[in-house]
Amino acid sequence: MKCIVGLGNPGAKYTNTRHNIGFLAIDALAKEHGIKLTESKFKAVFGTGMIKGERVVLVKPLTYMNLSGEAVRPLLDFYKIAVEDVLVIYDDLDLPLEKMRLRSKGSAGGHNGVKSLIQHLGTQDIKRLKLGVGRPPAPIQVIDWVLMPFAKSEQTTLQHVLSDSVNIATDFIDTPFLALMNRYN
């Protein structure tokens, strides 16, 4: 069984913000594969289904971003999913909106949601799909930028990014991660 986690913040005011691009990616993936995110426990909303013949759980933690690990750890324990079978999708300030990058491990890189996952999962060896949201233009502060909705002028690019993230997450199910990185990075 595989687990794909999108990081974000719960609540309507965060719905289409840059920090919630991980949630947007999970919603797009769920829609593509007909998986309903109707389960609600372990401080998360999630759904299970089949992708490429493999059972998969798609997860959106309902903790705030900085506590994401509190939702993911118990869910992995419940389903007996190994950390190496997890892909985490989240926003990255250091990549422009149209860019994305796969990584098999590493530090949190200043991302508090990833920091929480590393802390609760006990390893930095967490597979990730980082979706670029870009750096804020001056004088906008980072905290304000990531909590801003995407501009109308960014919507077409955002839809392409979400479509690409669906393809990558789908291929994660049956493709060795090194091959996945070679294909998409």
Swiss-Prot record:
Keywords: Cytoplasm, Hydrolase, RNA-binding, tRNA-binding. Belongs to the PTH family. Monomer. Hydrolyzes ribosome-free peptidyl-tRNAs (with 1 or more amino acids incorporated), which drop off the ribosome during protein synthesis, or as a result of ribosome stalling. Catalyzes the release of premature peptidyl moieties from peptidyl-tRNA molecules trapped in stalled 50S ribosomal subunits, and thus maintains levels of free tRNAs and 50S ribosomes. The active site is at residue 19. The record marks 91 as: Stabilizes the basic form of H active site to accept a proton. The record marks 9 as: Discriminates between blocked and unblocked aminoacyl-tRNA. HAMAP family: Pept_tRNA_hydro_bact. It catalyses: an N-acyl-L-alpha-aminoacyl-tRNA + H2O = an N-acyl-L-amino acid + a tRNA + H(+). Signal peptide: none annotated. GO terms for biological process: protein quality control for misfolded or incompletely synthesized proteins; rescue of stalled ribosome. TRNA binds at residues 14, 64, 66, 112. It comes from the Bacteria. GO terms for molecular function: peptidyl-tRNA hydrolase activity; tRNA binding. PROSITE patterns: PEPT_TRNA_HYDROL_1, PEPT_TRNA_HYDROL_2. GO terms for cellular component: cytoplasm. InterPro entries: Pept_tRNA_hydro, Pept_tRNA_hydro_CS, Pept_tRNA_hydro_sf. This is Peptidyl-tRNA hydrolase. Its EC number is 3.1.1.29. It is found in: Cytoplasm. Its main location: cytoplasm. NCBIfam families: pth (TIGR00447).
